[in-house]
């Protein structure tokens, strides 16, 4: 007990392995390492989303929807990292932190370019999470269950939502009123639906219900109407 008391509040010397916590039991070191690597990736993703928020929040951009979405996306990624770190600590593990690199791209030509980077980033997160799940599946049933129930559905939902947005932007284009209308719709969606990390999928009914009627043509096609503006 005295030995343990002396270790409270003290970090292990550089290059030395941390002392195992009393709660640690059958927590595979390979799974622990994979968890920590994914935590770093989530924090980098949060940093990336935060840089997008800063870009679109400038007065020369004033993209309300994008700023709200990017701020929320940054928050969600940071919260996922926190939940995973808390899980590692609950299992008696140790989170070894390292530097987070600055985002390679800090400016975007248009919304389509920005969402392309968002989708690519989210796919990297999903690939890492799937690799982590496969690592844990054969080594630690509790870890794999945590990933499947607490993480996987959330990331897949985010990927689907961002991909749907990108597909709509392909149709709308980057000229005219289209991007402005999309940004205003995005602002409403973020405020009305993104109240928890489980992001709902984007549907045509959602899109149409948040756009003024005058932006639809006679046949009810919003994309075609926007191109005429």
UniProtKB/Swiss-Prot annotation:
Keywords: Acetylation, Iron, Iron storage, Metal-binding, RNA-binding. GO terms for molecular function: ferric iron binding; ferrous iron binding; RNA binding. PROSITE patterns: FERRITIN_LIKE. The keyword RNA-binding applies. Residues 25-173 form the Ferritin-like diiron domain. Signal peptide: none annotated. The keyword Endoplasmic reticulum does not apply. GO terms for cellular component: cytoplasm. The modification N-acetylalanine is found at residue 1. Pfam families: Ferritin. InterPro entries: Ferritin, Ferritin-like, Ferritin-like_diiron, Ferritin-like_SF, Ferritin_DPS_dom. One of its GO terms (biological process) is intracellular iron ion homeostasis. Belongs to the ferritin family. Artemin is elongation factor-associated and self-associating. This is Artemin. It comes from Artemia salina. The lineage of its organism: Eukaryota, Metazoa, Ecdysozoa, Arthropoda, Crustacea.
């Amino acid at each position: 007990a005295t030995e343990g008391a002396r270790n409270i509040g003290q970090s292990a010397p550089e290059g030395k392995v941390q002392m195992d916590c009393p709660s640690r039991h059958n927590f595979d070191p390979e799974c622990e390492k994979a968890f920590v690597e994914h935590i770093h990736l989530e924090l980098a993703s949060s940093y990336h989303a935060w840089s997008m928020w800063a870009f679109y929040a400038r007065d020369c951009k004033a993209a309300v929807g994008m700023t709200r979405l990017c701020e929320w996306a940054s928050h969600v990624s940071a919260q996922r990292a926190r939940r995973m770190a808390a899980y590692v600590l609950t299992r008696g593990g140790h989170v070894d932190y390292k530097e987070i690199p600055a985002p390679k791209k800090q400016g975007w030509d248009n919304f389509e370019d920005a969402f392309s980077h968002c989708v690519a980033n989210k796919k990297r997160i999903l690939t890492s999470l799937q690799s982590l799940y496969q690592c844990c599946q054969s080594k630690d049933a509790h870890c794999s269950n945590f990933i499947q129930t607490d993480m996987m559905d959330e990331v897949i939902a985010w990927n689907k939502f961002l991909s749907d947005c990108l597909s709509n932007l392909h149709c709308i284009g980057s000229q005219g009123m289209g991007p402005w209308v999309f940004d205003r719709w995005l602002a409403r969606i973020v405020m009305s639906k993104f109240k928890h990390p489980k992001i709902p999928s984007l549907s045509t009914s959602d899109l149409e219900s948040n756009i003024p009627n005058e932006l639809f043509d006679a046949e009810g096609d919003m994309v075609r109407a926007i191109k005429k503006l």
